[in-house]
Amino acid sequence: MPEQIDGNKLDLEERVVTINRVAKVVKGGRRFRFTALVVVGDKNGHVGFGTGKAQEVPDAIRKAVEDAKKNMVFVPTVDTTIPHTVVGHFGGGEILLKPASAGSGVTAGGPVRAVLELAGVADVSSKSLGSNTPINMVRATIDGIKQLKNAEDVAKLRGKTVEELLG
């Protein structure tokens, strides 16, 4: 189990992915609230996402940022890209993440781009398979990131050195 990352100790940048107005129907009519989906990252291998709900948009965003700081994950990278191809799943959302050559940039749509850019991955290609709901795409991307392993981790799991592994 990886250690918990303290988001309060990092210099984080935040990006609002989506804001949604939701309604609760009561006897006197509708009561509106706002939900916010926010991604935070230090562009140096740490990224997290959070959701918040409140009567006003700024409060929802503040709550989402606090939640995101509690849900940080580490992103292993090789130079400016990810170590290997991976598919992340969540609900109906599925995201294919592939390493890309240097200078390619982040080839990804909306929510996935926000997660990858704030994670500090400069070159990656992605494809959304299935649901394109922002929350499902963000969660599927985070799931894919959690599956990533660098050469040192794989060598340790197999009981070999990195040189033996890479040939």
Curated annotation (Swiss-Prot):
Single GO BP term: translation
Domain S5 DRBM residues, every copy: 12-75
MF terms in GO: rRNA binding; structural constituent of ribosome
Keywords (A to Z) from UniProt: Ribonucleoprotein, Ribosomal protein, RNA-binding, rRNA-binding
InterPro entries in alphabetical order: Ribosomal_Su5_D2-typ_SF (IPR020568), Ribosomal_uS5 (IPR000851), Ribosomal_uS5_bac-type (IPR005712), Ribosomal_uS5_C (IPR005324), Ribosomal_uS5_N (IPR013810), Ribosomal_uS5_N_CS (IPR018192), Ribsml_uS5_D2-typ_fold_subgr (IPR014721)
Record-stated family: Belongs to the universal ribosomal protein uS5 family.
Role summary: With S4 and S12 plays an important role in translational accuracy.
Protein name: Small ribosomal subunit protein uS5
Species, as recorded: Listeria innocua serovar 6a (strain ATCC BAA-680 / CLIP 11262)
Gene name per UniProt: rpsE
